[in-house]
UniProtKB/Swiss-Prot annotation:
It is an enzyme of class 2 (transferase). Catalyzes the formation of 5-methyl-uridine at position 747 (m5U747) in 23S rRNA. The keyword 4Fe-4S applies. Keywords: 4Fe-4S, Iron, Iron-sulfur, Metal-binding, Methyltransferase, rRNA processing, S-adenosyl-L-methionine, Transferase. It catalyses: uridine(747) in 23S rRNA + S-adenosyl-L-methionine = 5-methyluridine(747) in 23S rRNA + S-adenosyl-L-homocysteine + H(+). GO terms for molecular function: 4 iron, 4 sulfur cluster binding; iron ion binding; rRNA (uridine-C5-)-methyltransferase activity. This is 23S rRNA (uracil(747)-C(5))-methyltransferase RlmC. It comes from Salmonella agona (strain SL483). InterPro entries: 23SrRNA_MeTrfase_RlmC, MeTrfase_TrmA_AS, MeTrfase_TrmA_CS, SAM-dependent_MTases_sf, U5_MeTrfase_fam.
Amino acid sequence: MQCALYDAGRCRSCQWITQSVNEQLSAKTADLHRLLAGLPVEQWCAPTGGPEQRFRNKAKMVVSGSVEKPLFGMLHRDGTPVDLCGCPLYPASFAPVFSALKPFIARAGLTPYNVARKRGELKYLLLTESQFDGGMMLRFVLRSETKLTQLRAALPWLRAQLPQLKVITANIQPVHMAIMEGETEIYLTDQQALAERFNDVPLWIRPQSFFQTNPTVASRLYATARDWVGQLPVRHMWDLFCGVGGFGLHCATPQMQLTGIEIAPEAIACAKQSAAELGLTRLHFQALDSTQFATAQGETPDLVLVNPPRRGIGKPLCDYLAQMAPRFIIYSSCNAQTMAQDIRHLPNYRIQRVQLFDMFPHTAHYEVLTLLCRL
């Protein structure tokens, strides 16, 4: 992949960009083998990749410059702004949105936040696109609610220019720190969730719910989990750290009892909406801490699927799973190092199957799916 920003030394986010995709995949596979050394693996499945460029469904843009000439991108190490509108990871459909937003910011009087001076209102623009229908969600991250009236007044012009904007919000982030978003979300449209669909499974994206940024590879990840679960005798399943329910919704059958647990209420609202659309009445999603939920249960499911953040599931949950001893565990991880540490805390399980998913091309990161079977 060619990138003018990388060639000019202005952006180093894609640190592996000079390597071919095959070289990157080989290096990631070697890293995974190294991390799982000493843990016998019955089957290494072929790694799964995706597009080399234009694959991201989300842009996170720092807004800098002036209200008349805003700049979208990031701040360089030396503090100077870098325009990322031409980033080759973004789909072509993002360009007209960025183009329309620049005059809109002037119309709405949204002064870009100046980090050095601690002045201004508009900190970030967060844009997400659905692969299902091309609909988009736009979030204005503001320092305060001061400009909300002006923002609302100017919105009809923006929506006329960009009818693909289905969900628009203002997120209030008052803290002078490099924090992407605050707790307060103010909806500026009637529609509050973006419709997505992977493998004929309806999914929903809300402003403060996590969603994978590489939909092509994510859909293959979910489909693989569904295939694996379909080969197992599973009637009762837990989906821990379930997010918007991608794994559970793919794996569930009308006969299966499934409980999905996620600490973010916004994500659980998405999962419940999807389950209702599918007519799956034995699926139950709850906004709880996954470890606290699991350790409070007296029953043992046939399978526990975990998809934790980078820190992994941790020793307390590992210890409880080892004691509870479900017949199967499926571990989906964006950090194979912590996954390997967790698996070593599950001595009564063998690794039946491992598959790498290249969710983050041009970086050292990847997703991995692992099936563990009780000895």
